[in-house]
Design a protein with these regions (language model features):
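Amphipathic alpha-helical coiled-coil/rod segments that serve as protein-protein coupling scaffolds
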Residues: 2-127, 141-145, 151-153
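Local beta-strand/beta-hairpin segments that build beta-sheet-rich folds
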Residues: 23, 132-133
Length: 153
């Protein structure tokens, strides 16, 4: 899902892992910085919405007594709608960045035994890379239904 440098291998070859168990930790400093930056931008956008909301309330009273023009009120209302859209956009960007941060920890898709480690600490993995990072061998019980005639007994 994301690319980066492998900081830690969180298992030993030949050990049993459960589905969802963390296997690798990518360097997440960039992802953390992105989340922090986008969170600050979101707070600025929310503050702008609050400012424009207060201004609109004031302008609503002023436009009724012709103290300001209808055009000025409409412009402020348009700015307010744009600011609300900016907040929604920043929430989506922040959500995506938080997801990227979560994906910096690579988990096992299935339970099984780690058969082979294909990347080591310090390796660079790319987003969309189709190569496996480790081989998890699923070791399950196998049940066989066999029909046997009484004469073969």
């Amino acid at each position: 899902q994301v690319g980066g440098i492998v900081d830690k291998v969180l298992f030993k070859q030949g050990t049993y892992v459960h589905a969802g168990q963390p296997l690798f930790k990518l360097n997440s400093e960039i992802f953390q910085a992105d989340v922090k930056s986008n969170r600050a931008t979101l707070h600025r956008a929310e503050a702008e919405v609050t400012r424009l909301q207060i201004l609109l309330k004031r302008y609503a009273e002023l436009v009724t007594v012709n103290a300001i023009s209808k055009q000025e009120y409409n412009n402020t209302e348009a700015e307010y709608q744009k600011a609300k859209a900016d907040v929604t956009q920043m929430e989506a960007i922040l959500s995506r960045q938080q997801l990227n941060l979560k994906y910096a920890t690579i988990t096992s898709p299935i339970s099984g035994i780690i058969g082979e480690i294909l990347v080591t600490e310090g390796a660079l993995v790319s987003q969309g890379d189709t190569k496996a990072m480790a081989v998890v061998q699923q070791i399950d019980k196998v049940y066989i239904d066999e029909k046997q005639s009484i004469t073969d007994y």
